[in-house]
Amino acid sequence: QNELSEGGFVIADESLAPLATGKFLNTAAIGVASKVLGLDLDLVCKALSEQFGKKDEAVAKENEDVLKKAYQWSASQKVSVKKLSEPKKNSRRLMMNGNDCIALGALAAGVKFCAFYPMTPSTTISLNLIKWADSAEIVVEQAEDEISAINMAIGASFAGATSMVATSGGGFALMAEAVSLAGMTETPVVIVVGQRPGPATGLPTRTEQAELEFILHAGHGEFPRAVFAPGSVEECFEVAYRAFHLAEKYQGPVFILTDQFLADSFRAVEPFKLEKYPPVIAGCRNKTIEEPYHRHAFTESGISPRLIPGLSKHLVITDSDEHYEDGHITEDLDIRKRMVEKRLKKLEGLKTEALKPDFFGDKNPSVLFVSWGSTKGACEEAAALLSKKGMKAASLHFSQVWPLMGNQFLDILAKAKKVISVESNATGQFARLIRRETGFEIKNNVNRYDGLPITPEYILKGVS
């Protein structure tokens, strides 16, 4: 009871103990919660009957008796919450979690190859694609390890298949060298990293946001990348779809950073209108190519024509060594310098397409919460709660954390009297990134790193 949040109440205490014993604990909890939420007892009993339909009749009867008694006990406590509204007629929604939406976004983008080695909390992305593999003509390969998985994806992409991998921080640690390979060969690949508390095995079934700096700098050498961090289940779909298009356009690795909380959080979402999401077309197809064809030709944008081996008369050559425009290796110092600059030119293009952060709340806030990834909802709710108390509050959320465009948000930060970074890590990694890229120092932080998700109450407690 001491841990109740503002407006919270106790729905069960010791007087319920005789009912909520042993194997009937969950059934009693359902009975109590059903009454509090105003659910019809007959409907709940019907659902329970379906759940226990395959068990012994006596077991089903015992559970139904406990359910009814717990429901009646709850009624005697005279505790209730705002009644749920009736759903809109003829309104169909999808019950999906973050990983479901990433998989669906990848499907909409036309993913054709996914390699993975199972690792919580990202595994269900690949398992979803396995379910759709036959109908969508996707190859999903469970590799022997993460090194093989990402190299398979890079190879498949070079051969013309829109490709991805899904892993967690520990698994991605094994992929870092191959990320450099994608950078050097300018090969598109989407890499989903589901964060969980580390170091090492850490807390494998809990949540954290401690891999931002790792992802920003993973892979030896300098080459461009984009990093997304969706803030909601719906954004998981949008970001996944966008990631594949950017990977193909700018020919390199694009990351999607999630975490256990977002990956496993279910939400009712409106159906996505897939006709609005044309799939990625890998490589330059049906386009006139200047001869002789050079895979790594110098261009003003840094983006070279990418042909798919075997789909034209041209020979497609690349290498992990530094190379000439035609893909053959070289140690020519001038070529080396020009190639580094060519690859980094693509970062300027990525900046022009960077997603603007989402702003929520008062336009001239006294308190501004800055967040990225899964803390979006908690920050917006915390801002709304402060606003109800008469305080000007707002939230600024980043669904793309690299590259950053300071001109998109510095004015907003400057207007706020107090800026607070909210992150599920111990060191304020995103706040440090903002300072490094823009010079703006966020002096106030709310950090959580015990493995539990950040809540509005946790934020407000940190503010006070």
Specify the residue positions occupied by each region the protein language model found.
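A short, gly/pro- and small-residue-rich
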Residues: 1-15, 182, 186, 430-447
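Short coil/turn connectors at secondary-structure junctions
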Residues: 5-9, 79, 90, 109-114, ...
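Short gly/pro/ser/thr-enriched loop/turn and capping motifs at secondary-structure boundaries
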Residues: 3-5, 17-18, 123, 147-150, ...
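Active-site cofactor/cluster-binding pocket
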Residues: 1-109, 113-115
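Flexible, low-complexity linker and terminal segments
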Residues: 95-103, 107-109, 239, 244-464
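Flexible, glycine/charged-enriched surface loops at secondary-structure junctions
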Residues: 43-44, 56-65, 77-86, 116-117, ...
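Thiamine diphosphate
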Residues: 113, 120-217, 226-247
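Gly-rich Lys/Arg/Thr-decorated short loops/hinges at beta-loop-alpha junctions or inter-strand turns
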Residues: 52, 76-91, 106-111, 130-136, ...
